[in-house]
Amino acid sequence: MNPDLDTGHNTSAPAHWGELKDANFTGPNQTSSNSTLPQLDVTRAISVGCLGAFILFAIVGNILVILSVACNRHLRTPTNYFIVNLAIADLLLSFTDLPFSATLEVLGYWVLGRIFCDIWAAVDVLCCTASILSLCAISIDRYIGVRYSLQYPTLVTRRKAILALLSVWVLSTVISIGPLLGWKEPAPNDDKECGVTEEPFYALFSSLGSFYIPLAVILVMYCRVYIVAKRTTKNLEAGVMKEMSNSKELTLRIHSKNFHEDTLSSTKAKGHNPRSSIAVKLFKFSREKKAAKTLGIVVGMFILCWLPFFIALPLGSLFSTLKPPDAVFKVVFWLGYFNSCLNPIIYPCSSKEFKRAFMRILGCQCRGGRRRRRRRRLGACAYTYRPWTRGGSLERSQSRKDSLDDSGSCMSGSQRTLPSASPSPGYLGRGTQPPVELCAFPEWKPGALLSLPEPPGRRGRLDSGPLFTFKLLGEPESPGTEGDASNGGCDTTTDLANGQPGFKSNMPLAPGHF
């Protein structure tokens, strides 16, 4: 959607070019003896610099938003799918529309012909419509998240989110394709003129479908979010929220920073503690409400940026006396474009998760690739393993500071101690185990397998052997030997063959935090 910036332009050269000095033209087929380039005044140079920086920032910022979700599994939620869709729409606008809008603004005329002008205007409407419809979907998603915080994972699934996003783009295409099918005013005689479609009925149709109807849905949803949030917060803090009577089994997946926990909450049984259930509800609700606040800021900025344009466009198309001056229309038009670079600023300022994701990406530390690189670099370095107490699985417990020393020291003549770990009920029985030490092996080579000795005090089981055993490579299993002074005095069942330890485990180990 671009304004008709120069409707009176009928010459073959731009009116804003400076005078050609020292130009001695001797004939139509002869060149000047001392030709010079058009002068570029300071104001126009500043405009080029500002518009170029604005477009570059919009492109880089929206790419960061997309990569943040793609490189962080805990950010791959249905809500963030809508955010990614919004970023894709803004990125498409920044790539395919803003450069040509800036060219039109700087040169003062269109240089790519009539057909491409129509395509460019349609893509403009498509991207802007997809942006606000994505915000409309986000507002509905936030209402469901706040109103039904516990049932949200089952109500809003990945499949439903993808279907909603497809619907957004289909509806946006329907609204934007009208001018390409002939629903527009007659084209001007000069192909160097290019602007928005000001056919009155299409201007009204596109304004309603692209802005006003989605805006009404957004306002209604966020009003309901505010009412529900206020009432639910009051009830939860007072501790009078009733337990759900119809739920038989509920699975909660709680994501807090980098901490992931799966818990199972069974039916109302004897000994059920209402306070713990209320605490879980309060945690879930607080998280959903915080997300609603962040996205509310995004919606508010979108309305502030695009509302002036969608007021000026239909009024100017329906009533010629109300058409704003060209200078005013340019301002409100570029104000709408300015919204494309605001969202990448809002997300890291309002969400610590997005801020950390941005910092990792800017530091070239996309999570998946970073783990693989650290695995290769560390080789046989000692890592901390902590058995996880939920569901009988093992989980990493190494802190970020301890995961990798700045010196990159590995097990070469040094001794590293693993902190005490809470054993998994499914494997280690009850009780807390003392610290387990990994002894230094001077001949330990990179790539050697790393494991833990059998935890002391483990209850015997008839159906399984030892959890961790070591054996010589290429030889049958044999009982281990007691540690001696050469290995730091640790009690292990380890022997070395050709500088590498053998390893056998009857239980899978979760890798450390790479």
Swiss-Prot record:
**Where is the stretch described as Disordered?**
391-429, 473-514
Record's keyword annotation contains Membrane: yes
Compartment annotation: Nucleus membrane; Cell membrane; Cytoplasm; Membrane, Caveola
Residues with a covalently attached lipid (S-palmitoyl cysteine): 364
Coarse class of the primary localization is: nucleus
**Stored Pfam families:** 7tm_1
Q: Any idea which residues bear Phosphothreonine here? A: 263
Residue window of motif Nuclear localization signal: 367-377
Coiled-coil annotated residue ranges, if any: none
What membrane topology does this protein have?
Multi-pass membrane protein
Q: Which InterPro entries match?
A: ADR_fam (IPR002233), ADRA1B_rcpt (IPR001115), GPCR_Rhodpsn (IPR000276), GPCR_Rhodpsn_7TM (IPR017452)
Q: Where is the composition biased (Polar residues)?
A: 409-423
- Any transmembrane segments, and where? 46-69, 83-104, 115-140, 161-183, 201-223, 295-318, 326-350
Topological domains on the Extracellular side lie at: 1-45, 105-114, 184-200, 319-325
Cellular component aspect of the GO annotation: caveola; cytoplasm; membrane; nuclear membrane; nucleus; plasma membrane
Under Gene Ontology molecular function, one entry of this record is: protein heterodimerization activity
Topology check: give the Cytoplasmic ranges. 70-82, 141-160, 224-294, 351-514
Q: Which SUPFAM superfamilies match?
A: Family A G protein-coupled receptor-like
Q: Which GO terms describe its biological process?
A: adult heart development; behavioral response to cocaine; blood vessel remodeling; cell growth involved in cardiac muscle cell development; glucose homeostasis; glycogen catabolic process; locomotory behavior; negative regulation of glycogen catabolic process
Q: Which domain of life is it from?
A: Eukaryota
Subunit (UniProt):
Homo- and heterooligomer. Heterooligomerizes with ADRA1B homooligomers in cardiac myocytes. Interacts with CAVIN4.
Member of which family? Belongs to the G-protein coupled receptor 1 family. Adrenergic receptor subfamily. ADRA1B sub-subfamily.
Q: What is this protein's name?
A: Alpha-1B adrenergic receptor
Q: Which organism is it from?
A: Mus musculus (Mouse)
